[in-house]
Amino acid sequence: LYFVLSDMDWVNCMYRFSIKWFNKVFLSAVRAAKRAREVVDRVRFINREVNSYIFRRVSPAFASYDRLSFAMCMCIRTLEHSGSGDFLSNAELGFLLTHHDLSEMSEREGLENPGLPWLHAEHWTLLVMLSEQSEVFNELPQIISENVEKWHNFYHCSSIVETPVPGYKGVSEWHKMILLKCIRPDSIINISHAIIRDTIGSEFLKRERLKLNRCYGYSDATTPMIFVLHESAYDPTETLRKYANKKDKNLIVLSVQKGREEVTEKTIRDAAKCGDWVLVENCHLLQSWMHRFEELFEEILTLAKNEALHSGFRLWCTSEPCAYFPVQVLQEGIKMMVESPTEFRETVLEAFDTMPLQDQDYWERPVAEGEEAQPKGETTVWKRTAFALVCLHANMVLRGDYSGIGWNCPYSFGIEDLRLSLLSMNLFTKSA
Protein backbone atom coordinates (compact mmCIF):
# COMPACT_ATOMS: atom_id res chain seq x y z
CA LEU A 1 0.00 0.00 0.00
CA TYR A 2 2.87 2.39 0.74
CA PHE A 3 4.31 1.89 -2.74
CA VAL A 4 0.91 2.72 -4.26
CA LEU A 5 0.99 5.92 -2.22
CA SER A 6 4.59 6.78 -3.09
CA ASP A 7 3.87 6.33 -6.82
CA MET A 8 1.28 9.13 -6.66
CA ASP A 9 3.99 11.79 -6.88
CA TRP A 10 4.23 10.85 -10.57
CA VAL A 11 0.70 12.21 -10.87
CA ASN A 12 1.27 15.41 -8.90
CA CYS A 13 4.51 16.63 -7.34
CA MET A 14 2.60 17.65 -4.19
CA TYR A 15 1.54 14.05 -3.44
CA ARG A 16 4.52 13.14 -1.27
CA PHE A 17 4.32 11.04 1.89
CA SER A 18 7.19 9.81 4.06
CA ILE A 19 7.64 6.25 5.29
CA LYS A 20 7.81 7.67 8.83
CA TRP A 21 4.36 9.22 8.41
CA PHE A 22 3.01 6.00 6.86
CA ASN A 23 4.30 3.86 9.73
CA LYS A 24 2.63 6.14 12.28
CA VAL A 25 -0.70 5.98 10.43
CA PHE A 26 -0.34 2.21 9.91
CA LEU A 27 0.16 1.57 13.64
CA SER A 28 -2.86 3.74 14.45
CA ALA A 29 -4.95 1.67 12.03
CA VAL A 30 -3.73 -1.62 13.55
CA ARG A 31 -4.66 -0.43 17.04
CA ALA A 32 -8.11 0.64 15.81
CA ALA A 33 -8.82 -2.65 13.99
CA LYS A 34 -11.46 -5.00 15.37
CA ARG A 35 -10.13 -7.79 17.61
CA ALA A 36 -10.63 -11.48 16.81
CA ARG A 37 -9.62 -14.82 18.31
CA GLU A 38 -8.73 -16.40 14.98
CA VAL A 39 -5.54 -15.12 13.33
CA VAL A 40 -7.14 -15.22 9.87
CA ASP A 41 -10.01 -13.01 11.03
CA ARG A 42 -7.65 -10.64 12.83
CA VAL A 43 -5.53 -10.23 9.67
CA ARG A 44 -8.65 -9.59 7.59
CA PHE A 45 -9.85 -6.91 10.03
CA ILE A 46 -6.41 -5.27 10.05
CA ASN A 47 -6.20 -5.21 6.25
CA ARG A 48 -9.66 -3.70 5.97
CA GLU A 49 -8.95 -1.05 8.64
CA VAL A 50 -5.53 -0.15 7.19
CA ASN A 51 -7.00 0.36 3.71
CA SER A 52 -9.86 2.46 5.07
CA TYR A 53 -7.73 4.47 7.50
CA ILE A 54 -5.00 5.26 4.98
CA PHE A 55 -7.57 6.31 2.39
CA ARG A 56 -9.32 8.63 4.86
CA ARG A 57 -6.02 10.25 5.79
CA VAL A 58 -4.74 10.83 2.26
CA SER A 59 -7.97 11.57 0.38
CA PRO A 60 -8.08 15.28 1.43
CA ALA A 61 -4.72 15.69 -0.32
CA PHE A 62 -5.93 14.38 -3.70
CA ALA A 63 -7.94 16.01 -6.43
CA SER A 64 -11.22 14.16 -7.04
CA TYR A 65 -10.05 12.37 -10.21
CA ASP A 66 -6.70 11.48 -8.61
CA ARG A 67 -8.58 10.02 -5.65
CA LEU A 68 -10.34 7.68 -8.09
CA SER A 69 -6.98 6.70 -9.62
CA PHE A 70 -5.55 5.97 -6.17
CA ALA A 71 -8.55 3.77 -5.30
CA MET A 72 -8.13 1.87 -8.57
CA CYS A 73 -4.43 1.32 -7.83
CA MET A 74 -5.43 -0.03 -4.42
CA CYS A 75 -7.78 -2.48 -6.16
CA ILE A 76 -5.03 -3.62 -8.53
CA ARG A 77 -2.53 -4.23 -5.72
CA THR A 78 -5.17 -5.99 -3.61
CA LEU A 79 -6.06 -8.43 -6.40
CA GLU A 80 -2.41 -8.96 -7.39
CA HIS A 81 -1.54 -10.08 -3.86
CA SER A 82 -4.69 -12.16 -3.42
CA GLY A 83 -4.05 -14.07 -6.67
CA SER A 84 -7.64 -13.65 -7.82
CA GLY A 85 -8.47 -15.62 -10.95
CA ASP A 86 -10.75 -12.82 -12.19
CA PHE A 87 -7.84 -10.39 -12.42
CA LEU A 88 -5.92 -9.54 -15.57
CA SER A 89 -2.76 -11.08 -16.94
CA ASN A 90 0.34 -8.88 -17.23
CA ALA A 91 -0.31 -8.41 -20.95
CA GLU A 92 -3.93 -7.42 -20.34
CA LEU A 93 -3.00 -5.03 -17.54
CA GLY A 94 -0.39 -3.44 -19.79
CA PHE A 95 -3.00 -3.04 -22.51
CA LEU A 96 -5.38 -1.35 -20.06
CA LEU A 97 -2.81 1.11 -18.72
CA THR A 98 -1.02 1.93 -21.97
CA HIS A 99 -1.91 4.57 -24.53
CA HIS A 100 -1.77 3.00 -27.99
CA ASP A 101 -0.32 4.76 -31.02
CA LEU A 102 -2.65 3.55 -33.77
CA SER A 103 -0.62 5.21 -36.53
CA GLU A 104 1.87 2.33 -36.28
CA MET A 105 -0.94 -0.17 -36.88
CA SER A 106 -2.41 1.48 -39.97
CA GLU A 107 -0.13 -0.38 -42.41
CA ARG A 108 -0.93 -3.84 -41.06
CA GLU A 109 -3.23 -6.09 -43.08
CA GLY A 110 -6.39 -7.54 -41.59
CA LEU A 111 -7.25 -4.50 -39.48
CA GLU A 112 -9.89 -3.09 -41.80
CA ASN A 113 -13.36 -2.57 -40.39
CA PRO A 114 -15.49 -5.48 -41.78
CA GLY A 115 -18.40 -3.29 -42.88
CA LEU A 116 -19.64 -2.06 -39.49
CA PRO A 117 -20.59 1.60 -40.07
CA TRP A 118 -21.50 2.19 -36.41
CA LEU A 119 -18.01 1.14 -35.22
CA HIS A 120 -15.18 3.63 -35.69
CA ALA A 121 -12.07 2.34 -37.49
CA GLU A 122 -9.86 3.14 -34.48
CA HIS A 123 -12.16 1.16 -32.22
CA TRP A 124 -11.95 -1.87 -34.49
CA THR A 125 -8.14 -1.62 -34.54
CA LEU A 126 -8.08 -1.61 -30.74
CA LEU A 127 -10.38 -4.65 -30.64
CA VAL A 128 -8.03 -6.58 -32.94
CA MET A 129 -5.05 -5.59 -30.77
CA LEU A 130 -6.95 -6.74 -27.68
CA SER A 131 -7.68 -10.14 -29.25
CA GLU A 132 -3.94 -10.60 -29.82
CA GLN A 133 -3.03 -9.91 -26.17
CA SER A 134 -5.93 -11.43 -24.23
CA GLU A 135 -6.80 -15.12 -23.95
CA VAL A 136 -10.34 -14.20 -22.90
CA PHE A 137 -10.92 -12.13 -26.06
CA ASN A 138 -8.75 -14.09 -28.53
CA GLU A 139 -11.78 -14.74 -30.79
CA LEU A 140 -13.31 -11.28 -30.36
CA PRO A 141 -13.29 -10.12 -34.05
CA GLN A 142 -14.95 -13.36 -35.14
CA ILE A 143 -17.60 -13.19 -32.40
CA ILE A 144 -18.45 -9.59 -33.33
CA SER A 145 -18.80 -10.55 -37.01
CA GLU A 146 -21.15 -13.41 -36.08
CA ASN A 147 -23.32 -11.27 -33.75
CA VAL A 148 -23.42 -7.92 -35.54
CA GLU A 149 -26.91 -6.89 -34.40
CA LYS A 150 -26.29 -7.80 -30.76
CA TRP A 151 -22.99 -5.91 -30.73
CA HIS A 152 -24.66 -2.93 -32.40
CA ASN A 153 -27.20 -2.84 -29.55
CA PHE A 154 -24.45 -3.38 -26.98
CA TYR A 155 -22.36 -0.54 -28.42
CA HIS A 156 -25.25 1.94 -28.26
CA CYS A 157 -26.59 0.76 -24.89
CA SER A 158 -26.94 3.58 -22.34
CA SER A 159 -26.29 1.16 -19.44
CA ILE A 160 -23.41 -0.69 -21.07
CA VAL A 161 -21.64 -1.35 -17.74
CA GLU A 162 -24.52 -3.55 -16.52
CA THR A 163 -25.21 -5.16 -19.93
CA PRO A 164 -23.68 -8.64 -20.59
CA VAL A 165 -21.08 -8.85 -23.35
CA PRO A 166 -22.65 -10.57 -26.42
CA GLY A 167 -21.17 -13.99 -27.14
CA TYR A 168 -19.45 -14.30 -23.74
CA LYS A 169 -20.42 -15.73 -20.37
CA GLY A 170 -19.01 -14.72 -17.02
CA VAL A 171 -16.73 -11.92 -18.23
CA SER A 172 -15.17 -10.23 -15.18
CA GLU A 173 -15.52 -6.50 -14.62
CA TRP A 174 -11.79 -6.05 -15.24
CA HIS A 175 -11.97 -7.72 -18.65
CA LYS A 176 -15.06 -5.73 -19.45
CA MET A 177 -13.14 -2.56 -18.59
CA ILE A 178 -10.51 -3.42 -21.23
CA LEU A 179 -13.26 -3.98 -23.76
CA LEU A 180 -14.94 -0.66 -22.93
CA LYS A 181 -11.61 1.11 -23.26
CA CYS A 182 -11.63 0.02 -26.90
CA ILE A 183 -15.19 0.90 -27.88
CA ARG A 184 -16.77 3.07 -25.14
CA PRO A 185 -14.07 5.00 -23.25
CA ASP A 186 -16.82 7.28 -21.91
CA SER A 187 -17.91 4.39 -19.65
CA ILE A 188 -14.53 3.88 -17.97
CA ILE A 189 -15.43 6.05 -14.96
CA ASN A 190 -18.69 4.17 -14.37
CA ILE A 191 -17.11 0.72 -14.52
CA SER A 192 -14.24 1.94 -12.33
CA HIS A 193 -16.82 2.84 -9.69
CA ALA A 194 -18.33 -0.64 -9.97
CA ILE A 195 -14.92 -2.32 -9.60
CA ILE A 196 -13.95 -0.23 -6.57
CA ARG A 197 -17.33 -0.90 -4.95
CA ASP A 198 -17.01 -4.67 -5.41
CA THR A 199 -13.29 -4.96 -4.57
CA ILE A 200 -12.60 -2.68 -1.59
CA GLY A 201 -15.97 -1.12 -0.76
CA SER A 202 -18.24 1.81 -1.58
CA GLU A 203 -16.66 4.00 1.13
CA PHE A 204 -13.70 4.53 -1.23
CA LEU A 205 -16.01 6.30 -3.68
CA LYS A 206 -17.31 8.94 -1.29
CA ARG A 207 -16.18 12.46 -2.06
CA GLU A 208 -16.16 14.33 1.21
CA ARG A 209 -15.83 18.07 1.36
CA LEU A 210 -12.69 19.45 2.97
CA LYS A 211 -13.16 19.40 6.74
CA LEU A 212 -10.66 21.60 8.57
CA ASN A 213 -11.66 20.22 11.95
CA ARG A 214 -10.77 16.64 10.98
CA CYS A 215 -7.44 17.60 9.38
CA TYR A 216 -6.57 19.77 12.37
CA GLY A 217 -7.27 16.83 14.67
CA TYR A 218 -4.54 14.82 12.93
CA SER A 219 -1.93 17.56 13.47
CA ASP A 220 0.40 18.82 16.17
CA ALA A 221 2.73 21.83 16.43
CA THR A 222 5.35 20.20 14.18
CA THR A 223 2.88 19.38 11.39
CA PRO A 224 2.66 21.90 8.53
CA MET A 225 -0.87 22.36 7.18
CA ILE A 226 -0.70 22.83 3.40
CA PHE A 227 -3.57 24.06 1.24
CA VAL A 228 -2.85 22.89 -2.31
CA LEU A 229 -4.63 25.24 -4.70
CA HIS A 230 -6.20 23.39 -7.61
CA GLU A 231 -7.26 25.05 -10.86
CA SER A 232 -9.92 27.73 -10.25
CA ALA A 233 -9.77 26.99 -6.52
CA TYR A 234 -11.23 29.41 -4.00
CA ASP A 235 -9.08 31.28 -1.48
CA PRO A 236 -9.27 29.36 1.83
CA THR A 237 -8.09 32.35 3.92
CA GLU A 238 -11.54 33.44 5.08
CA THR A 239 -12.53 29.87 5.95
CA LEU A 240 -9.35 29.44 8.00
CA ARG A 241 -9.86 32.82 9.68
CA LYS A 242 -13.35 31.75 10.75
CA TYR A 243 -12.00 28.43 12.06
CA ALA A 244 -9.22 30.22 13.99
CA ASN A 245 -11.82 32.45 15.67
CA LYS A 246 -13.81 29.35 16.58
CA LYS A 247 -10.68 27.86 18.17
CA ASP A 248 -9.92 31.20 19.87
CA LYS A 249 -6.57 31.41 18.06
CA ASN A 250 -4.75 34.44 16.69
CA LEU A 251 -4.18 33.93 12.95
CA ILE A 252 -1.37 35.92 11.34
CA VAL A 253 -1.65 36.06 7.54
CA LEU A 254 1.61 36.61 5.66
CA SER A 255 2.04 37.10 1.93
CA VAL A 256 5.43 35.99 0.65
CA GLN A 257 7.04 39.01 -0.98
CA LYS A 258 10.54 39.69 -2.21
CA GLY A 259 12.42 41.85 0.27
CA ARG A 260 10.23 40.84 3.23
CA GLU A 261 11.58 37.35 3.78
CA GLU A 262 13.24 38.23 7.10
CA VAL A 263 10.01 39.73 8.46
CA THR A 264 8.15 36.55 7.49
CA GLU A 265 10.74 34.31 9.15
CA LYS A 266 10.78 36.38 12.37
CA THR A 267 6.99 36.30 12.56
CA ILE A 268 6.97 32.50 12.24
CA ARG A 269 9.68 32.11 14.91
CA ASP A 270 7.80 34.35 17.34
CA ALA A 271 4.51 32.53 16.68
CA ALA A 272 6.18 29.16 17.32
CA LYS A 273 7.09 30.31 20.83
CA CYS A 274 3.83 32.03 21.78
CA GLY A 275 1.36 29.60 20.14
CA ASP A 276 -0.13 31.75 17.38
CA TRP A 277 -1.19 30.42 13.98
CA VAL A 278 0.62 31.63 10.86
CA LEU A 279 -0.70 31.39 7.31
CA VAL A 280 1.93 31.87 4.59
CA GLU A 281 0.07 32.59 1.35
CA ASN A 282 1.06 31.69 -2.22
CA CYS A 283 4.39 29.98 -1.52
CA HIS A 284 4.69 29.09 -5.21
CA LEU A 285 5.27 32.74 -6.14
CA LEU A 286 8.70 33.02 -4.49
CA GLN A 287 10.84 30.08 -5.55
CA SER A 288 14.05 31.64 -4.20
CA TRP A 289 12.67 31.54 -0.63
CA MET A 290 11.68 27.89 -0.61
CA HIS A 291 15.05 26.63 0.65
CA ARG A 292 14.79 29.06 3.59
CA PHE A 293 11.28 27.81 4.23
CA GLU A 294 12.63 24.27 4.60
CA GLU A 295 15.39 25.48 6.95
CA LEU A 296 12.74 27.31 8.97
CA PHE A 297 10.76 24.09 9.29
CA GLU A 298 13.89 22.32 10.56
CA GLU A 299 14.25 25.07 13.18
CA ILE A 300 10.70 24.33 14.32
CA LEU A 301 11.56 20.63 14.67
CA THR A 302 14.63 21.60 16.72
CA LEU A 303 12.47 23.74 19.00
CA ALA A 304 10.19 20.74 19.51
CA LYS A 305 13.14 18.53 20.49
CA ASN A 306 14.28 21.16 22.99
CA GLU A 307 10.70 21.45 24.32
CA ALA A 308 10.64 25.14 23.38
CA LEU A 309 7.83 24.85 20.82
CA HIS A 310 4.37 25.97 21.94
CA SER A 311 1.86 23.14 21.55
CA GLY A 312 -0.78 25.52 20.17
CA PHE A 313 1.37 26.69 17.25
CA ARG A 314 0.33 25.79 13.71
CA LEU A 315 2.05 26.64 10.44
CA TRP A 316 -0.41 26.93 7.55
CA CYS A 317 0.48 27.70 3.95
CA THR A 318 -1.14 27.89 0.53
CA SER A 319 0.56 26.95 -2.71
CA GLU A 320 -0.20 25.86 -6.22
CA PRO A 321 1.50 22.59 -7.27
CA CYS A 322 5.19 23.30 -7.92
CA ALA A 323 8.22 21.03 -8.17
CA TYR A 324 10.36 23.28 -5.95
CA PHE A 325 8.12 23.12 -2.89
CA PRO A 326 10.24 21.70 0.01
CA VAL A 327 10.01 17.91 -0.01
CA GLN A 328 10.43 17.53 3.76
CA VAL A 329 7.58 19.95 4.44
CA LEU A 330 5.34 18.02 2.02
CA GLN A 331 6.21 14.63 3.49
CA GLU A 332 5.68 15.66 7.10
CA GLY A 333 2.71 17.95 6.48
CA ILE A 334 -1.01 17.44 6.08
CA LYS A 335 -2.04 18.35 2.55
CA MET A 336 -5.53 19.62 1.76
CA MET A 337 -6.58 19.96 -1.88
CA VAL A 338 -8.69 23.06 -2.47
CA GLU A 339 -10.66 22.46 -5.66
CA SER A 340 -13.90 23.48 -7.27
CA PRO A 341 -16.72 20.90 -7.03
CA THR A 342 -17.79 19.05 -10.17
CA GLU A 343 -21.50 18.49 -9.42
CA PHE A 344 -24.41 20.81 -8.67
CA ARG A 345 -25.10 19.43 -5.19
CA GLU A 346 -21.43 19.56 -4.22
CA THR A 347 -21.12 23.12 -5.52
CA VAL A 348 -24.06 24.26 -3.38
CA LEU A 349 -22.76 22.46 -0.27
CA GLU A 350 -19.30 23.94 -0.83
CA ALA A 351 -20.85 27.41 -0.87
CA PHE A 352 -22.62 26.79 2.44
CA ASP A 353 -19.27 25.79 3.97
CA THR A 354 -17.71 29.19 3.27
CA MET A 355 -18.19 32.73 4.49
CA PRO A 356 -20.54 34.55 4.77
CA LEU A 357 -23.01 31.63 4.62
CA GLN A 358 -21.30 29.98 7.59
CA ASP A 359 -22.32 32.95 9.71
CA GLN A 360 -25.76 32.32 11.20
CA ASP A 361 -26.41 36.06 11.46
CA TYR A 362 -26.19 36.40 7.68
CA TRP A 363 -29.40 34.41 7.31
CA GLU A 364 -31.38 37.01 9.26
CA ARG A 365 -32.84 39.63 6.91
CA PRO A 366 -30.64 42.77 6.74
CA VAL A 367 -32.22 45.73 8.48
CA ALA A 368 -31.83 49.26 7.10
CA GLU A 369 -31.11 52.24 9.33
CA GLY A 370 -34.22 53.42 11.14
CA GLU A 371 -36.12 50.21 10.35
CA GLU A 372 -37.44 48.11 13.18
CA ALA A 373 -35.74 44.73 13.50
CA GLN A 374 -37.89 41.78 12.55
CA PRO A 375 -38.30 38.89 14.99
CA LYS A 376 -36.06 35.94 14.22
CA GLY A 377 -37.72 33.44 11.93
CA GLU A 378 -39.54 36.02 9.79
CA THR A 379 -36.82 36.01 7.16
CA THR A 380 -38.18 33.45 4.70
CA VAL A 381 -37.97 35.71 1.64
CA TRP A 382 -34.38 36.72 2.41
CA LYS A 383 -33.31 33.09 2.89
CA ARG A 384 -34.93 32.08 -0.39
CA THR A 385 -33.18 34.92 -2.20
CA ALA A 386 -29.78 33.95 -0.79
CA PHE A 387 -30.39 30.28 -1.64
CA ALA A 388 -31.44 31.24 -5.18
CA LEU A 389 -28.19 33.18 -5.62
CA VAL A 390 -26.19 30.14 -4.48
CA CYS A 391 -28.04 27.92 -6.99
CA LEU A 392 -27.47 30.48 -9.75
CA HIS A 393 -23.76 30.46 -8.95
CA ALA A 394 -23.66 26.64 -9.08
CA ASN A 395 -25.36 26.71 -12.48
CA MET A 396 -22.89 29.25 -13.82
CA VAL A 397 -19.93 27.21 -12.57
CA LEU A 398 -21.14 23.96 -14.14
CA ARG A 399 -21.92 25.60 -17.48
CA GLY A 400 -18.16 25.94 -17.86
CA ASP A 401 -17.96 22.16 -18.35
CA TYR A 402 -19.45 22.65 -21.81
CA SER A 403 -16.58 24.87 -23.04
CA GLY A 404 -17.70 27.22 -25.82
CA ILE A 405 -21.28 25.96 -25.67
CA GLY A 406 -21.53 27.02 -22.03
CA TRP A 407 -19.86 30.44 -22.19
CA ASN A 408 -18.49 32.35 -25.18
CA CYS A 409 -15.83 33.87 -22.91
CA PRO A 410 -14.65 31.33 -20.30
CA TYR A 411 -14.66 32.46 -16.67
CA SER A 412 -14.16 30.35 -13.55
CA PHE A 413 -16.92 31.91 -11.37
CA GLY A 414 -15.03 31.05 -8.19
CA ILE A 415 -16.30 31.04 -4.63
CA GLU A 416 -14.91 34.56 -4.18
CA ASP A 417 -17.35 35.83 -6.83
CA LEU A 418 -20.22 34.27 -4.90
CA ARG A 419 -18.98 35.71 -1.61
CA LEU A 420 -18.82 39.23 -3.04
CA SER A 421 -22.27 38.81 -4.61
CA LEU A 422 -23.78 37.71 -1.30
CA LEU A 423 -22.19 40.61 0.56
CA SER A 424 -23.34 43.04 -2.14
CA MET A 425 -26.89 41.69 -1.94
CA ASN A 426 -26.78 42.18 1.82
CA LEU A 427 -25.56 45.77 1.37
CA PHE A 428 -28.16 46.63 -1.28
CA THR A 429 -30.96 45.22 0.87
CA LYS A 430 -29.90 47.39 3.79
CA SER A 431 -29.84 50.52 1.63
CA ALA A 432 -33.10 49.74 -0.21
Task: List each model region and its residues.
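Amphipathic alpha-helical coiled-coil
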Residues: 1-432
